[in-house]
Design a protein with these regions (language model features):
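A short acidic, Gly/Pro-enriched loop at the edge of an enzyme's catalytic core
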Residues: 100-112
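A short glycine-rich, Lys/Arg-flanked "PGG" loop and its adjoining helix->strand segment in the class I
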Residues: 125-140
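Class I SAM-dependent methyltransferase SAM/SAH-binding core
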Residues: 44-101
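Core SAM-dependent methyltransferase catalytic element
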Residues: 196, 202-226
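N-terminal, positively charged/glycine-rich alpha-helical extensions of SAM-dependent methyltransferases
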Residues: 1-15, 161-162, 172
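C-terminal alpha-helical "lid/dimerization" subdomain adjacent to the S-adenosyl-L-methionine
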Residues: 72, 144-198, 202, 208
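Hydrophobic beta-strand segment of the Class I
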Residues: 14, 112-113
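Conserved alpha-helix/loop element of class I SAM-dependent methyltransferases that forms part
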Residues: 23-43, 58
Length: 226
């Protein structure tokens, strides 16, 4: 099963899917991501693999609506669901495009955000190069993603829970295959240190990461410098 097939199936239950995969804690993790971003009035962000616009809404709330967000997602179903869900918000633009080929000019954005999306990119290196291209000088890349648990006992519990996720998926959307795919992408995603190096290979500077919940997820960030 490919990423686009998965999101065609789960689009109208995407937020519920995040609840299942994170036991509801994705809301706290996303707030931590926005905290670290330190949004400012007039900031322009691109929210890649933005799904239903959850991250963009959190960003706009922090700047009291005085900012601009572009939600970019390769999946038409996700974009249409996001538009419908946020039809009253005029500060969000919606664009259907893959992360590897963004339809924007160089140095267009102050920040590039991706939440639980990078592991589904077809080509992570190419997507990161695109992130670097569309960011302004001193622009910031910030990514929230499932990662490698650092605590042995917690890792065992997390492994057991991961095996249960497809069962929940069967109950919620009537199909366990999307959830098997998503748990597999989590297992195959690079470690925190390895992903840090991958980001650096796309010419980002001052790259660092923070673990949340002992590495169940990590937030990586880096800057575009001259």
């Amino acid at each position: 099963m490919k990423a686009q097939e998965v999101f065609n199936i789960v689009a109208n239950k995407y937020d519920l899917m995040n609840d299942v995969m994170s036991v509801g804690t994705h809301r706290y993790w996303k707030e931590c991501m926005i905290d670290w971003l330190e949004p400012f009035v007039g900031m322009k962000i691109i929210d890649v693999a933005g799904g239903t616009g959850d991250i963009s809404l959190r960003f706009l709330k922090r700047v009291n609506g005085e900012g601009e967000a572009v939600v970019c997602d390769p999946n038409d179903s996700m974009i249409e669901y996001g538009k419908k869900k946020n039809s009253s918000n005029q500060n969000i633009k919606w664009v259907t495009a893959p992360a590897e080929s963004l339809p924007f000019e160089n140095e267009s954005f102050d920040a590039y955000l991706v939440s639980f999306g990078v592991r589904n990119f077809d080509n992570i290196k190419k997507a990161l190069d695109e992130a670097h291209r569309v960011l302004k000088i001193d622009g910031r890349f910030i990514c929230l993603e499932f990662s490698k648990v650092q605590n042995r006992e917690l890792s065992k519990l997390y492994s057991v829970y991961s095996k249960m996720i497809p069962i929940f998926g069967k109950i919620i959307v009537g199909d366990e295959k999307p959830y098997k795919y998503l748990t597999r992408t989590i297992e195959n995603f690079p470690s925190q240190e390895r992903f840090k190096r991958i980001i650096e290979e796309s010419n980002f500077s001052n790259v660092e990461f923070r673990n949340l919940f002992n590495g169940v997820v990590a937030i990586h960030t880096g800057w575009k410098k001259i």
